[in-house]
Design a protein with these regions (language model features):
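Juxtamembrane/disordered regions of integral membrane proteins
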Residues: 1-163
Length: 163
């Protein structure tokens, strides 16, 4: 993997994490956003980059590494965006979508919050590396099925003109 590909992966992961983090305080949507951040962020970023021709997965090793990078970066940006929004909402309008989590964000020391975010980031990297691995096999399965359905073109040797 070259630096350009890794930079694209990180940028799109940051964008996805911030979007998920900003939408997470909405009631009933927050749980779905957390599930997307924990499990589905690697397939989303990988499929987008593959369709945009910015990423080419050649081995399972690259898919696992890509999934781990996506998972960790999405979790860090998700956590920063979510903690910032919840701190602002809790201080200004006394809103809390999850009382225990909001209390922890507001009252805990920064180092403890950082350790918690990194711990969850490693968990998110692990689950997303597995989902990236599964995505690699699903993409290859679809490619193989597509190639089998296409008729094999014979060379133009079989083509003859009749008068």
């Amino acid at each position: 993997m070259d630096k350009f590909v890794v930079k694209n992966i990180i940028v799109f992961s940051l964008i996805l994490g911030v979007i998920l983090g900003l939408m997470a305080p909405i009631p009933y949507i927050g749980t779905f956003m957390l599930i997307v951040a924990l499990i589905l962020s690697a397939p989303l970023v990988m499929i987008y980059l593959i369709m945009d021709n910015r990423l080419e997965l050649t081995t399972t090793k690259y898919s696992i590494i890509t999934g781990a990078i996506v998972g960790f970066v999405v979790n860090i940006s998700f956590s920063i965006a979510y903690a910032s929004v919840m701190a602002i909402l809790a201080k200004t309008i006394n809103y809390s979508s999850n009382f225990i989590l909001t209390t922890m964000i507001i009252n805990s020391p920064i180092w403890l919050l950082g350790v918690f975010i990194i711990f969850i980031g490693v968990l998110c990297a692990t689950t997303n590396s597995f989902s990236g691995f599964v995505t690699y096999y699903i993409i290859n399965f679809i490619r193989d099925m597509y190639e089998r359905q296409l008729p094999k073109n014979k060379e133009d040797d079989d083509f003859t003109l009749q008068k």
